[in-house]
Swiss-Prot record:
Entry-linked InterPro entries: TatB
Cellular compartment(s): Cell inner membrane
Compositionally biased spans, kind Basic and acidic residues: 136-146
Quaternary assembly: The Tat system comprises two distinct complexes: a TatABC complex, containing multiple copies of TatA, TatB and TatC subunits, and a separate TatA complex, containing only TatA subunits. Substrates initially bind to the TatABC complex, which probably triggers association of the separate TatA complex to form the active translocon.
Keywords carried by this UniProt record: Cell inner membrane, Cell membrane, Membrane, Protein transport, Translocation, Transmembrane, Transmembrane helix, Transport
Transmembrane segments: 1-21
GO biological process: protein transport by the Tat complex
Name of the featured protein: Sec-independent protein translocase protein TatB
Recorded family membership: Belongs to the TatB family.
Provenance organism: Granulibacter bethesdensis (strain ATCC BAA-1260 / CGDNIH1)
Length: 177
């Protein structure tokens, strides 16, 4: 209870032997033991009464809270709070590795298809030529437009289009089997 070491108890015993004397030590030990027993029983009784008061006071509140929580759908409530328009969910649902249709060049009144080659097959010259062509002729593939439109609201539109045009950073190797 008080975390006494054996050496401290021995020092207390020696001091008691010297102060009280060997003749009165058994009576003093009985008195100390009686006081410790009484203190323990009072502490246990107090603890029991406090526990009973806590149970009586909180049980009704706990029941009401539990009944209120029983009908709550936490997943639905969190998704409604964090993503009210569903834009974050659609961002994570899109597959960036899915094949995209050929890009459309919006030049005059009509749109025509452009040949699409894998990113890793482009040379540096082709890449710079394509970049200048994209900015000059406003090339927008339907996949790029869709990815830019589904970008989260906090991303500016210009940045959304730039990041949607970029090829993915990781292209998995072809299956060898």
């Amino acid at each position: 209870m008080f975390d006494f070491a054996w050496s401290e108890i021995a020092v207390i015993g020696v001091v008691a032997l010297v102060v009280i004397g060997p003749k009165d030590i058994p009576g003093a030990v009985r008195g100390v033991a009686r006081m410790v027993r009484k203190a323990r029983s009072m502490a246990a009784e107090f603890q029991g009464q406090m526990d009973q008061m806590m149970k009586e006071a909180d049980l009704g509140d706990v029941r009401e809270t539990f009944n209120d929580l029983r009908g709550v759908n936490l997943r639905q409530q969190l998704s409604r709070t964090l993503d009210p328009d569903g834009s974050m969910r659609s961002t994570f649902d899109n597959n960036p590795m899915a094949p995209s249709p050929a890009p459309m060049i919006m030049g005059g009144d009509e749109a025509h298809m452009v040949e699409e080659r894998p990113f890793h097959s482009l040379s540096v010259m082709d890449e710079s030529h394509m970049a200048s062509e994209w900015t000059r002729e406003k090339t927008v593939s339907s996949e790029t437009a869709r990815r830019a439109a589904t970008a989260p609201a906090f991303i500016p539109p210009g940045e959304a289009f730039r990041s949607a045009r970029r090829a993915p950073a990781f292209i998995p190797p072809a299956d060898q089997g």
